[in-house]
C-alpha cells in the first residue's frame, strides 16, 4: 500500500518544479491529484506524466491570488474525489531580477510577490480549512515557505513574503489543531533551476546554468544544490499519516544551510 492510498490532494504550481515533482510522488503513493497551475498546458503535462505511471490526476487553471479560482480548485477535488484530504500551497515566485536590492523593487514588484507568495497561501489555507471542517475535521495543509523566511540572506521583499508564509503556517496549525487539521511547511534553500532561472537565468547558456548550480550548491554544507525531488520527498512524509503527530513545523530542505 502507498502512503497516500485513497487520498485526494490539490497541488498548486503543479506545472513545474516542486509542484510537478510532488504531484508525481503523491500519485506514486496512491493519491488522486488536482494539478493546479496558472499555465494550464503545464498542468496538463504533469497530468500526462502522472497517468503514464498509472496515477490519476486532473488539470485545472488557477491564479492563486484570485479567491474564486482557489475555491474552484478545491471544489474540483471534492467533485472528482468526494472530499479533500491534502492541500499543498506550493506556488511562489522569486524576486523579479537576479541580485535586486530593496531599492530596485517597484511597488508593482512588491504587490506581485505579496499577492502570489502570501495572499495565495492565505487563500489556500482559508478555503482548505473551510472544506476540512465541512467534512468533520482532519486533513492536511502543506505550504512552501523558504529558508529566506527563516534567516536573513538578502532578497528582502521575497524573504518578507516567505516569512509571512512561515507564520501563517504556525498560526493556522495552532488554530486548527482542535479540529485534527495538521499544517506544516517545507522551507527549501535556493534551487538553481527554479528560483534563479525564473528570475532571469533561463537566458543563460547551458554551461552558465551549470556554473550557477555549482555555485548555489557550494553554499550548502552538504555541498550540492537542492532539487525539486528533495522537496517532494519531504512533502510526501509531511502529508502522510507517518507525520500524524507533526504540526506547525517549518522543515528546512536546505543541505544544512540554516544550521550553519
Region annotations inferred by a language model:
Residues 98-102, 106-111, 202, 212, ...:
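Substrate-binding pocket helix/loop in short-chain dehydrogenase/reductase
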Residues 103-122, 142, 165:
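Catalytic Tyr-X3-Lys loop
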Residues 116-135, 173-174, 178, 240:
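Amphipathic alpha-helical dimer-interface segment in Rossmann-like NAD(P)H-dependent oxidoreductases
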Residues 122, 222-253, 258:
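C-terminal substrate-recognition "lid" of short-chain dehydrogenase/reductases
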Residues 125, 161, 169:
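Active-site helix of classical SDR
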Residues 146:
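Residue(s) in the substrate-gating loop at a strand-loop-helix junction
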Residues 177, 182, 246-248:
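Short, small/polar-rich loop/turn modules that mediate ligand/substrate recognition or access, typified
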Residues 178, 190-219, 230:
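A glycine/serine/threonine-rich, flexible loop-to-helix segment
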Amino acid at each position: 500500500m502507498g502512503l497516500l492510498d485513497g487520498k485526494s490532494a490539490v497541488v498548486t504550481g503543479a506545472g513545474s518544479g516542486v509542484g510537478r515533482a510532488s504531484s508525481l510522488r503523491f500519485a506514486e503513493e496512491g493519491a488522486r491529484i488536482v494539478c493546479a497551475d496558472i499555465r494550464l498546458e503545464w498542468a496538463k503535462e504533469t497530468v500526462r506524466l502522472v497517468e503514464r505511471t498509472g496515477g490519476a490526476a486532473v488539470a485545472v487553471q488557477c491564479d492563486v491570488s484570485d479567491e474564486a479560482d482557489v475555491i474552484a480548485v478545491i471544489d474540483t477535488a471534492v467533485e472528482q474525489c468526494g472530499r479533500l484530504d491534502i492541500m499543498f500551497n506550493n506556488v511562489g515566485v522569486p524576486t523579479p531580477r537576479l541580485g535586486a536590492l530593496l531599492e530596485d523593487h517597484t511597488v508593482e514588484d512588491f504587490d506581485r510577490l505579496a499577492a502570489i507568495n502570501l495572499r495565495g497561501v492565505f487563500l489556500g489555507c482559508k478555503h482548505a480549512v473551510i472544506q476540512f471542517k465541512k467534512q468533520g475535521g482532519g486533513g492536511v495543509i502543506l505550504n512552501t515557505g523558504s529558508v529566506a523566511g527563516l534567516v536573513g540572506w538578502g532578497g528582502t521583499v521575497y524573504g518578507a513574503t516567505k516569512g509571512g508564509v512561515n507564520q501563517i503556517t504556525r498560526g493556522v496549525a495552532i488554530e486548527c489543531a482542535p479540529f485534527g487539521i495538521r499544517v506544516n511547511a517545507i522551507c527549501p534553500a535556493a534551487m538553481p533551476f527554479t528560483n534563479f532561472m525564473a528570475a532571469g537565468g533561463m537566458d543563460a547558456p547551458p554551461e552558465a546554468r551549470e556554473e550557477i548550480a555549482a555555485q548555489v550548491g557550494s553554499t550548502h554544507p552538504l555541498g550540492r544544490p537542492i532539487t525539486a525531488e528533495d522537496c517532494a520527498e519531504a512533502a510526501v512524509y509531511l502529508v502522510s499519516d507517518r507525520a500524524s503527530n507533526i504540526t506547525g513545523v517549518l522543515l528546512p530542505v536546505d543541505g544544512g544551510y540554516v544550521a550553519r
